[in-house]
Amino acid sequence: MTPGDPILGMTEAFVADKRPGKVNLGVGIYCDEQGKIPLLRAVREVEEAMAREGKPRGYLPIDGLAAYDQATQRLVFGAESPLLEAGRVATSQTIGGSGALRVGADLLRKALPKAKVAISSPSWENHRVVFTAAGFEVVDYAYYDAATHGLDFPGMLADLGKLEPGTVVLLHACCHNPTGVDLTVEQWQQVVALVKERNLLPFIDMAYQGFDKGTDADAAAVRLFAASGIDSFVVANSYSKSFSLYGERVGALSIVGATREEAQRVQSLVKRTIRSNYSSPATHGGALVAGVLGSAELRVLWESELAEMRERIHAMRAGMVEKLAAQGLGRYEFIQRQAGMFSYSGLSKAQVDRLREEFAIYAIGTGRICVAALNRANLDTVVNAVAAVSK
């Protein structure tokens, strides 16, 4: 038997646990103050309108709903992006962010059969799985500094500088998973310059746009690469979190070409790759996202709802740090400096095991916790348990 997915396996154990007051800090889902997955008002308005219209659900084109692809381009690259004006971006709706990664990986494997893929150490577990399954050799570049609970930026630059030209570099645009440690704009500028100098191929994964500072600020890495003069790069993005549409599997793959003609050729290759995989994406989730982003009024409402989610996560980080400090554990202050849904808590596997066994609190063995799963009702429970295993 193949080894099970650690996150899915942990979720199964959590569901089977009958203890009251259990808390799941392992799975990557945003929950509201009631511990529920929210249904956003902007999404609900589009869904209700769709239900009233009663449109049939035919197959979408291979690259998805045109309105969805166009709205994605504006959100990811910026509405005034020169790349969009020049027609240099080929975008396809995909089955979630994972689907975007796999379609992109399959396409690049055919185009660059001798290239390697470099991912951050650590990275989201599925990054290595996806690119390995596509046939790539995957290598690591330095990223997280366990001693400072921050970014090992000198190590990152050193490792990127050693990569062979043509290497595909997987970069997290914002809200790094699993660490929550991000680059500053100034650091991104240095990375962009180095990637360009070394002739590396950037593959940017943006699954959490809007969960740190806002939709535009969180796309800074994409915008910097777009302005850099680099001929080609790849972006995979997901709406699972930002639209709270986890089960709808709404993602997109965008590939920048050197010219309009190259982008058109790339789009043809992407469609061929999709056709041999799942033929076309699902209708419902894409229509919801396109409906929200295509309405000025609903776009404003969605941005405000996204801001509420973002601010609640910030508040949970601050509350956790404050309550731990009150128990003499000021060393956890770094949690407040991290961004997005996740935190590399610094807890050891032994401490994580104790949280599960003694307190019915579930987390990943690496110490990653989902801050978005905290709320006012369970925060004290979690803090007291973390304090107990930390002393």
Task: Specify the residue positions occupied by each region the protein language model found.
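Hydrophobic "anchor" residues on beta-strands that sit immediately upstream
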Residues: 168, 201, 233-234
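Hydrophobic beta-strand scaffold residues
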Residues: 25, 138, 202, 362-363
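Conserved core of the PLP fold type I
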Residues: 44, 49, 54-197, 210-211, ...
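Active-site PLP attachment segment
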Residues: 220-265, 269
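Conserved PLP-binding catalytic core of the aspartate aminotransferase-like
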Residues: 302-358
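N-terminal "arm"/small-domain region of PLP-dependent enzymes with the aminotransferase-like
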Residues: 1-67, 71-74, 78, 276, ...
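Structural signature of PLP-dependent enzymes
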Residues: 267-286, 292-321
